[in-house]
Structures are given as C-alpha cells and as structure tokens.
A protein has these predicted regions:
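Acidic, Mg2+-coordinating active-site environments of NTP-dependent enzymes
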Residues: 69-75, 181-337, 362-365, 390-399, ...
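Active-site beta-alpha connecting loops in nucleotide-dependent enzymes
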Residues: 48, 324, 342-417, 464
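Short amphipathic alpha-helix with an adjacent loop that forms part of the alpha/beta core around
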Residues: 173, 428-436
Length: 464
C-alpha cells in the first residue's frame, strides 16, 4: 500500500489537522483490532458501532493518525472532517485519479467475486491489484482504491456491489473504470431496488460514470434492459453459439460455447465435473461444475484479451485457476461429497448451483440438499423460495434441510414431503443430522446462515 502525505489527506478530504503528524502515513484502516504501525485509523460509524470509541485502541496498535468527525483530547494526531465515510471516498477517488494503469470495474447480480478472481488470475496476480474478498461497498471500494500504486501494479480490478438506489453513483464515480464488466442482471436485492429494470439502471451507472467511451463486456441477454440498450454502442457482447446475433457490428460480438466435462471417480463417489469454454476455436477447461462460473469466465477471458494478455498466458492461467471462498466446487470428506457454494445466494445462482450439483452426482448416490434462505428479495421472497423448492426432485433416499425464517423455509418446503425435509432457523440444529449422512451434500444460502459450519473441516477460508 502506498504512503500518504498528511497534507494530501487534508486537501483531498477538506479536513483540518489537530496536531499534524510529522511522518508519512502508511495506509488506512477502520478496524482498531487490525491496525498496523504507521497507519491512519478512520473512525467510521457503522451500524451500532462508532469508531470514535476506539481511538485509544488504534493509537496503542501503532496508528500515527486518525480521521475523525469529533476530536478527542489524546496525543494521537487527528484530521477532523464533516463525515468520515465521505472523506474515505474522497481519498479513494483521489488515489484512483493518480493511478495511470488500466482499471476494470465489475458489477452484476451474482458472480462478481468469482469473475473478479478469475480476471485477476488472467492478468497476473503479482501485478494486479484487486478487491479483497467481496469488499465491494462504500467502505470496501475506497479502501481498495487506497492501495493503488502505479509503480507496483499493472492493472486494477475493482468489484462494485449495491443493494439500494444511488449507491453506484458514488462507487462508479470513484472507480472511473477504463473497462467495464457486467456479469448479469438477476433477482437480487429486490427489497430496496424493487425490479430488474431498476437493478439494471443502477448497475449501468458503473459504465455511465466510467472513463468516456470505455467498453463494457456483457452477455447478450443483458441487452434486454433499457439501461444497457443505451450502452450497446460501447458493448462487447458475448453470444452463445446458435443464438441469433443482435443488430450490432460483427466486431462487437464474440461467439462462445460452454460444454461439460465429466470424470467418474468411482461408483461411490461424485463425478469430478468441470466446464469448458470455447471462444474463437480455443478451448479453456474450468475447474468448476457451475455453468454460471463458466459463462462468467468467458467474460474474464474476453477482458484479458482486450487488455493485451497473450493467448498462451490466458490458457495457462485459466487451467491453474480454482474456485475459492466457498464459491462453487466439490470436496470429498470420507463418505461425504460436498458441493460447496455457500458464500451467498439469489434465485439465479441457486438454480445454477442446484443444476451443477445434480449433474455432478451419480444416480446411485443419496443426496442431502441444504438450502439457506435467499435474503433481500422483498415482497417476492416467498414466491422465489417456492419456485426454487419446486426444482428439488427428491427420491426416496434423498433429504433436504432449509435454514432461515419460518415463512421462507416453509416456502422452500411447500412441494416436499414433511418426512423428507427439515425446516430450521439455525444451522447448528442440523449439524448432527448432516454429520451422519452418507452421500452427496449440497450447501448454498445467503451469507448470514453460515452453512460452511456444516463442513467437517474447520480450515476452509471464506476470504482467501
């Protein structure tokens, strides 16, 4: 992370120093428990927590300064601003404007993080600065931008996530992307965004606020939304083989195909499933059974080509990539094979994961479906959960468990025999049941349900 001159921080934020530090500042941190010597602590008010209460702890941890809304009579130098979160955004925007290398902005309803990780891999991890985990909100984006350094990095890949109106205005304005990537527009965060058209309109602001004329790479079905139709002249459109082309110049269209690869690991084990993406006659094997991940990998490949990565490096890096952070892969523990995709969920990603799990599991193996509720779907939540429940075709030897509120778990279970399913509000209540099951186990749900707690291993890391 680059160092900052205290006077620059004051200029970017419009703040005033009280006891200005005499040394350069070595990065930013908003969690006093994780402060490193030389950093500046940002006192943010997050939910019920007020960062101003932790100034002394930050100082003890080695902070050389703090950004505050209200100063405290302690030795620690403090930069007083009107709003700490706005100040953080101003710092992120300032550092973005100083970065001279290509910046890729990624958004979408699902698949943002896996697409970001794939593109980071394709561009070369050692020289690519990217969002950590899914740190993609009003705090995460400027914190990510604060690590930009043109002397150390050749590319930046920044993920932007929203769940309410007007968020992307702030994020897109900070990111100022040179290249935009949209994974998809699906039913996610409907609670505050209310419709798919509204979601598309909000997410399109990433491209609207990007560098003038910067391209946007997207799948053809995203052009059904008015917000993206307006951007079609800037689009690089991925089109599945056999699908009619939109009315665009041929140079804007990239044909691709996703095909499945299977390797049988034995009569009592799940198949080793993977996907293959074909673009312009080149085949790229992908270590995930998810068709959604494969389709988004196609976006990352096209982005890497646009940014000048040579074909041999792209192919080598695609083959080396592995899903991470509990996002779409198979893992076997003795007599159990888990399909692990439990970082988050919405109706589209849930349907894709169920399809991948069912295709990856031989017919003779019993299946246990564990579905956490899908949050932030607003008034349509019950209908979406009921529709997903109807996708489960349980055989006599199969079982299901649904974790979440009574309303949503009952919606999941509406088409399933009570003798074959469990509805619960807490994952802890089904641990012993899962531990005793022999067969293939599906795990997916919204983040709050922590379905990874059902895994035998305690060493899986959600944010590698």
């Amino acid at each position: 992370m680059p160092s900052f001159d205290p006077q620059d921080l004051a200029g970017w934020t419009g703040g005033s120093w009280f006891n200005e530090p005499k040394v350069a500042i070595e990065g930013l941190c908003f969690d006093a428990r994780q402060i490193k010597p030389g950093q500046c602590f940002i006192a943010l008010k997050i939910s019920a927590r007020d960062g101003h209460e932790f100034l002394e702890q930050a100082a003890r941890g080695g902070a050389v300064a703090a950004i505050v809304e209200n100063t405290k009579p302690i030795v620690l130098p403090q930069l007083k601003v009107s709003d700490s979160l706005v100040a953080l955004g101003a710092i992120g925007a300032a550092l973005r404007s100083k970065f001279s290398k290509p910046v890729v902005g990624i958004t979408g309803s699902c698949g943002k993080t896996s697409t970001k990780e794939m593109l980071r891999c394709l561009l070369g991890e050692d020289r690519t600065h990217a969002t950590a985990g899914n740190w993609n909100n009003r705090i995460g984006v400027p914190m990510t931008l604060s690590g930009l350094d043109s002397n150390q990095q050749d590319f930046a890949v920044i993920e932007a996530g929203i769940n309410q109106p007007n968020e992307m205005v702030q994020l897109g304005g900070m990111i100022q992307a040179d290249l935009n990537v949209l994974t998809n527009i699906e039913a996610a965060h409907l609670e505050l965004l209310s419709s798919l058209e509204n979601i598309a309109s909000e997410k399109s602001l990433l491209a609207e606020l990007a560098k003038p004329g910067s391209p946007i790479i997207l799948h053809v079905d995203s052009l059904r939304f008015n917000a993206y139709k307006k951007l079609a002249h800037r689009a690089i459109v991925l089109l599945p083989e056999g699908v009619a082309a939109p009315d665009l110049p041929s140079k804007q269209i990239v044909r691709y195909k996703v095909s499945e690869q299977m390797e049988n690991l034995g009569a009592n084990r799940a198949l080793q499933a993977s996907q293959q993406v074909t673009i312009n006659g080149q085949n790229y094997p992908i270590a995930s059974p998810s068709e959604g991940i494969a389709s988004n990998t196609a976006l990352a490949i096209v982005a890497a080509k646009y940014l000048g990565i040579v074909e041999s490096d792209i192919r080598k890096r695609v083959e080396a990539w592995r899903p991470s952070g509990n996002r779409g892969y198979l893992e076997t523990f003795r007599e159990q094979t888990f399909y692990i995709d439990c970082y988050n969920a919405n109706p589209s990603s849930m349907a894709d994961a169920l399809d991948a799990f069912d295709r990856s599991t031989p017919q003779n193996i019993a299946r246990f479906y564990v579905l956490g509720a899908m949050d932030e779907l607003g008034t349509t939540a019950s209908a979406h959960h009921e529709a997903i429940g109807h996708l489960l075709k349980l055989r006599p030897q199969d079982r299901a468990a649904f974790v979440g509120s009574k309303e949503l778990t009952n919606a999941y279970a509406s088409a399933i025999s009570p003798q074959q399913c469990i509805c619960t509000d807490n994952v802890e209540k089904i641990k012993s049941t899962i531990a005793q099951f022999q067969g293939a186990i599906f795990l997916k749900g919204s983040r709050k349900y922590s379905l990874e707690k059902l895994l035998p291993s305690k060493n899986l890391n959600l944010n590698p």
